[in-house]
Amino acid sequence: MTESQETPITEDGEARPHRRIKSFVMRAGRMTEGQQRGLEQGGPLFILPLADSPVDYDQVFGRSAPRTLEIGFGMGHSLLEMAAAAPELDFIGVEVHRPGVGALLNGVLTQGLKNLRVYDCDAIEVLNRCVADNSLDRLMLFFPDPWHKARHHKRRIVQPEFAELVRRKLKVGGVFHMATDWEPYAEHMLEVMKVAPGYRNQAADGAYVPRPEERPITKFERRGERLGHGVWDLKFEKVD
């Protein structure tokens, strides 16, 4: 995700603040009863407000535990599965699409999970305003919008500025884990991360890692595998 490179000027000659190019488009969607239940009953319990200063997540969760943040969890199936499988870890999910937030929260309520919280706003704002530097053990970005057309590549969230923002938020030893089913985007991710300072690629061959066991396989991924489509996982560890 990048900022515009040109500073707009107002009619009176004053510089207008940059308007950041966003990596997502808000889409309207109909809610199921379960999604609506998740928002109405789970929202007050599990949706966190956008803060103006770093949040004390130990206080939010009532404990100190390794912390994972996922950007763009979609309908929440993978995040829900990971949180249920690892109650000793704390998870924060960020998603702007309300049906997905509702679906995740409905699952949280149904399973009685205590180790998951949600932001329903722009992930860049969450990282900049709510997450303290050197505080995350893992940041996950699974199947972000690849923005296929060349003129839209500037909207891809994985850009040098984003890699640096993630690095600041990770602890030393923390991992930035990305996955995509679009090979040109995987190549773009690798190009960005290979030259991003302060990271080490965990892949033995300096490219992609085998699918980690902790990342659940989605139904779309299974369908893609049947059709012969690939999935590329990248893991970069913060070393500085």
Swiss-Prot record:
GO terms for molecular function: tRNA (guanine(46)-N7)-methyltransferase activity. InterPro entries: SAM-dependent_MTases_sf, tRNA_(Gua-N-7)_MeTrfase_Trmb, tRNA_methyltr_TrmB_bact. It comes from the Bacteria. PROSITE patterns: SAM_MT_TRMB. CDD domains: AdoMet_MTases. It holds the Pfam family Methyltransf_4. Substrate binds at residues 149, 181, 218-221. GO terms for cellular component: tRNA methyltransferase complex. Pathway: tRNA modification; N(7)-methylguanine-tRNA biosynthesis. Its EC number is 2.1.1.33. Keywords: Methyltransferase, S-adenosyl-L-methionine, Transferase, tRNA processing. S-adenosyl-L-methionine binds at residues 70, 95, 122, 145. It catalyses: guanosine(46) in tRNA + S-adenosyl-L-methionine = N(7)-methylguanosine(46) in tRNA + S-adenosyl-L-homocysteine. The keyword Kinase does not apply. The active site is at 145. Belongs to the class I-like SAM-binding methyltransferase superfamily. TrmB family. Catalyzes the formation of N(7)-methylguanine at position 46 (m7G46) in tRNA. This is tRNA (guanine-N(7)-)-methyltransferase. It comes from Pseudomonas entomophila (strain L48). The lineage of its organism: Bacteria, Pseudomonadati, Pseudomonadota, Gammaproteobacteria, Pseudomonadales.
